A protein has these predicted regions:
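Asp-based, Mg2+/Mn2+-dependent phosphohydrolase catalytic module
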Residues: 1-5, 17-18, 68, 100, ...
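N-terminal helical cap/lid subdomain that shapes the substrate entry/recognition surface
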Residues: 2-101, 122
Length: 231
């Protein structure tokens, strides 16, 4: 019986890469408007090159790009980029369809809810609260809570302990097969791959279930628990 569902956050509950691309695009426009002499497409590519190398959560991304490409960090250019980024990010941070419907249905069925994210603690909570999801989740585990990223067993162990369930009583939902699915399966959890959020052109997720929509989780719980709980 599934007693708890654990969700990844980015590209599982929220459309993170849509937000990231829009925010970087706006930041590039703002820096160029402030006097940075570089084609926009080239600047965006340089930003993402460093993101992919050093981490998509890098909080000093614009400093690094400016220092690497121009030999100095102009505070006016930097400020313009940060402000442009923040304004765009807040404007396009959105949930995938049916997320609230799904979470409400799970809670109605008596299923505990948690989040495991590789992002820093404050960044995770800013997203959760901004999206008004903080009332749904009993516990949230971030990178700062264990110092380990998925597929390490530590984040999964922590969330299972906090939720008070065994691995076989939990379902992990995530978009990144190599982290979310592999890590959870090694722990003995059931797994559901959020295909709708896949950014890696994954061919075989290895998950027990594949989701085309978040509300597919409700059908999984009904199947696993043997009764229609989530209506």
């Amino acid at each position: 019986m599934i007693k708890a569902v654990v969700f990844d956050l980015d590209n599982t509950l929220m459309d993170f890469m849509r937000m990231k691309r829009a925010a970087v695009d706006a930041a590039a426009d703002a820096m160029i408007d402030a006097g940075l002499n570089i084609p926009k497409k080239e600047l965006v590519e340089k930003i993402f090159t460093i993101y992919w190398k050093e981490g998509i959560e890098d909080q000093n991304i614009f400093d690094k790009v400016l220092q690497k490409e121009f030999g100095r960090v102009d505070p006016k250019i930097l400020a313009a980029g940060i402000i442009g980024y923040r304004r765009a990010k807040d404007g396009v941070m959105t949930l995938y369809p049916h997320v609230r419907l799904t979470l409400a249905g799970l809670l109605k069925a008596g299923v505990k809810l948690g989040v495991v994210s590789d992002a820093p603690r404050l960044a995770v909570w800013l997203r959760i609260v901004s999206l008004e999801l903080h009332h749904y989740f009993e516990h949230v585990v971030t990178y700062d809570d264990t110092g380990k990223r998925k597929p390490s067993p530590e984040p999964f162990k922590r969330i299972l302990e906090l939720l008070g369930v065994s691995a076989k009583e939990a379902l992990m939902v995530g978009d990144w097969a190599e982290r979310d699915i592999v890590g959870a399966k090694k722990m003995g959890m059931k797994t559901a791959w959020a295909k709708y959020g896949d950014e890696f052109k994954t061919v075989n997720s290895g998950a027990d279930y594949e989701l085309l929509d978040t509300q597919d989780v409700l059908a999984i719980i009904e199947k696993e628990n043997g009764r229609r709980q989530c209506l």
